[in-house]
Amino acid sequence: MDFLTADLCDEFSDRLQILAPGYASFGGHARFAGRIATLKVFEDNSRVREMLSEPGEGRVLVVDGGGSRRCALVGDQLGALAVRNGWAGIVVYGCIRDSVALGLLPLGVRALATHPLKSVKNGVGERELAVTFDGATFRPGDWLYADEDGVITSPDPLL
């Protein structure tokens, strides 16, 4: 990807939202972009697997995990599933695991931290709704751009 979030902020700041700093990059792609798809879950990644099983078509899955640091919502198996199905990236308001394996995948992954414990699988969660965390609202169909400097969203494509 050939963009810098700093340059996009300079040019389009009036129509952007910026995710608060603190999200580490765990995927093999530090820079990624795509249309947003959303999930709202809490310590249950069943819906994450469901969503990543669908064609990604270059989208970015934004998972509002409530900021939980008690288990991981994404690991190497879900990362590999995302790659197979054409997802550009995953942003998690929560934790991931299998960070070394995720780092080898051609996928963008941002999350608060790592945690070795897997989540429960009770099939609970909501999809394709606006989710807000850490200063930004993520709406299905909006655009997300992530690089080494941060994560931004826009209602319109910027590139």
UniProtKB/Swiss-Prot annotation:
It catalyses: 4-hydroxy-4-methyl-2-oxoglutarate = 2 pyruvate; oxaloacetate + H(+) = pyruvate + CO2. GO terms for molecular function: 4-hydroxy-4-methyl-2-oxoglutarate aldolase activity; metal ion binding; oxaloacetate decarboxylase activity; ribonuclease inhibitor activity. Its EC number is 4.1.3.17, 4.1.1.112. One of its GO terms (biological process) is regulation of RNA metabolic process. Divalent metal cation. Keywords: Lyase, Metal-binding. Substrate binds at residues 75-78, 97. A divalent metal cation binds at residue 98. It is an enzyme of class 4 (lyase). Pfam families: RraA-like. It comes from the Bacteria. Its cofactor is a divalent metal cation. Belongs to the class II aldolase/RraA-like family. Homotrimer. Catalyzes the aldol cleavage of 4-hydroxy-4-methyl-2-oxoglutarate (HMG) into 2 molecules of pyruvate. Also contains a secondary oxaloacetate (OAA) decarboxylase activity due to the common pyruvate enolate transition state formed following C-C bond cleavage in the retro-aldol and decarboxylation reactions. This is Putative 4-hydroxy-4-methyl-2-oxoglutarate aldolase. It comes from Laribacter hongkongensis (strain HLHK9).
